[in-house]
Amino acid sequence: MRWILCWSLTLCLMAQTALGALHTKRPQVVTKYGTLQGKQMHVGKTPIQVFLGVPFSRPPLGILRFAPPEPPEPWKGIRDATTYPPGCLQESWGQLASMYVSTRERYKWLRFSEDCLYLNVYAPARAPGDPQLPVMVWFPGGAFIVGAASSYEGSDLAAREKVVLVFLQHRLGIFGFLSTDDSHARGNWGLLDQMAALRWVQENIAAFGGDPGNVTLFGQSAGAMSISGLMMSPLASGLFHRAISQSGTALFRLFITSNPLKVAKKVAHLAGCNHNSTQILVNCLRALSGTKVMRVSNKMRFLQLNFQRDPEEIIWSMSPVVDGVVIPDDPLVLLTQGKVSSVPYLLGVNNLEFNWLLPYIMKFPLNRQAMRKETITKMLWSTRTLLNITKEQVPLVVEEYLDNVNEHDWKMLRNRMMDIVQDATFVYATLQTAHYHRDAGLPVYLYEFEHHARGIIVKPRTDGADHGDEMYFLFGGPFATGLSMGKEKALSLQMMKYWANFARTGNPNDGNLPCWPRYNKDEKYLQLDFTTRVGMKLKEKKMAFWMSLYQSQRPEKQRQF
């Protein structure tokens, strides 16, 4: 009788412990580096445990500027993890970009610091013995010069799909990608930060209820390009098991800086650090304050259209380099050789990638006065390095896209100009990458997202999906802002389900959703909108045109799809 009473008390205590784990307002987890105390929130009746500002590296300050990240210092006692960490130092429009992607009812203003190697974790509350959950690690976009983990809210996706979400951030711009193309500054610091975060996930995510053996990378724009690049990096092998690239791959022209020493010398010149010795140059830049480095960054005028400058001298961004270690070779060469991670890959584009956000940031004049064929030709001339075309090919592009357009139809001219940029960059790079992964025998799923979100209030309404619009639906924006209609909520649920299914199994289908065909030789893809449809051969004729241009430039690297 006595042992029955003891056992009953034990079971009662276990149940109370489990219940406490589910409902405590100040959840704690023990990581490899120390104990964290987070906070609990609810999505409907589902409790979500949130841990903010979790260090995955030592602060990249002093001698660690322009150096690989190092593991974080362990701490004693309980570390508070209830405050959003500062984003990495970045361009001033990073705050605007953060407002654009935010799905919170009230916007959280970002802070910025060079001490920024932190991540945020959103995990469904669990009872002891519950099975481990799939892990999804988000890579922010921002042209490698803006972006922050705290711009994103993960509670809806984590709660509705029972996944553990990790939002990372990494060094940006000069801090993240300065390279002298030698041992004094090899570059790719931002990519190394990403891999340090992924190693932290492998070591610690089980404490949050996540499965380190089921990690999916997903990201947008520059984040999507980074993921595509990590799929070609031997240093990232074993750190993830599936990958999703939204509006960007490593074949995007912006991903690789082809002459990093030239860029480093320009940075040094603007900073007053000119020197023939790259060692002295780097040490001089390392000694500057973060504020001074950002003043130099502002003078570089990244991502700015400039009609007065020689297009060959325009530096669009600071970005990764082929260093032989992190990125062993040109991404196109690696893809051609099939040197990619053997993991399922889901990727896609939006149908109006160059509609408002990017033209606004890049100061593209798309107003009525500027929309003339002569002005568009000048724009193409100025952006030809971004579009990856030669000056001799500019007239061919004008003929292909503008030949049958009335000179006075400024709206059609604007639409064609937007088509040129998105086709030459996002669409071409995405489709080519999909083909190479498919031909390597890997599962590939392709999409085109087509719906503009009513809840994105910082830009004008359009009839299609601008760059980044899909994130509003992926992170449950229609449920958070109160500005969406029922159909948008249904689309959001559908997207969350597709993405989470892919994270669970490597296949977005589950029998309850419209079938998403695998991307094979028939080139079928999913058109995501209120009515989901299957398309075939996305922009086939235009892609054939761009293929012919690029083949004529470097036939030794290109091949037909």
Swiss-Prot record:
Signal peptide: 1-20
CDD domains in UniProt: Esterase_lipase
Domain of life: Eukaryota
Record keywords: Disulfide bond, Glycoprotein, Hydrolase, Secreted, Serine esterase, Signal
Transmembrane helix keyword on record: no
Keyword set includes tRNA processing: no
Listed EC numbers: 3.1.1.-
Disulfide bonds listed in the record: 88-116, 273-284
An example Gene Ontology CC term for this record: extracellular region
Residues bearing attached sugar chains per UniProt: 214, 276, 388
Active-site residues, as the UniProt record annotates them: 221, 353, 467
Alphabetized GO MF terms: carboxylic ester hydrolase activity
Gene3D superfamilies: alpha/beta hydrolase
Places the protein is found: Secreted
Family: Belongs to the type-B carboxylesterase/lipase family.
Task performed by this protein: Probable carboxylesterase.
Record PANTHER family: CARBOXYLESTERASE
Name of this chain's protein: Carboxylesterase 4A
